[in-house]
Amino acid sequence: MRIAICGSACQGKTTLVNDFIKQWPKYKRSEESYRKVIKKENLKLNKEVDQDGQWKILNCLIDDIQKTEKGDNIIFDRCPLDNLVYSLWSEEKQSSDIDKKFIEKCIPLVQESMRAIDIVFFIPITKAAPVKIELKNTREIDEEYIKEIDNIFKVISHTMAATGVCPFMTKDDRPPIIEI
């Protein structure tokens, strides 16, 4: 099973992936080549994303998925949906060169690549189990920004749960998004 973990910054995604692998050692972590590209090319992230960086990250996320096959036991710390959410935020805020045309170029790639994911676990911000925000590597620590990203994920997750529709995934062949 190919599992993706998604959500805003500082919500415990990597911790969940690490704990999951300890509990179920037959699962492997994806290559996460996008992290290497971010570091190697010093790509802009979070509030400073731009088309060039988001395009490179999206393609790395897709490449990692394409290296797998149906039946592989792999867990992804982030997926193309994450990339699209961050791009949507930037387009909405008009904080960079990311525009509607760029979003429209990305959506078909996200739709196609998400078909290869069997299930998406979304880790939302909750009052019941708050996660301490820690400065680490390229992590964003602006609480308002983190909440705004979380809200975009929640709209996607709740809309899909209520209507069965998600404009960023194909209708007939998409993974469920399960909020945990």
Can you annotate each of these PLM segments?
Residues 86, 90-161, 172-175, 179:
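A glycine- and Lys/Arg-enriched "phosphate-lid" helix/loop adjacent to the NTP-binding pocket
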Residues 10:
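Walker A (P-loop) phosphate-binding loop of P-loop NTPases
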Residues 21-63:
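Conserved substrate/cofactor phosphate-moiety recognition/catalytic segment
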Residues 13:
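Conserved lysine of the Walker
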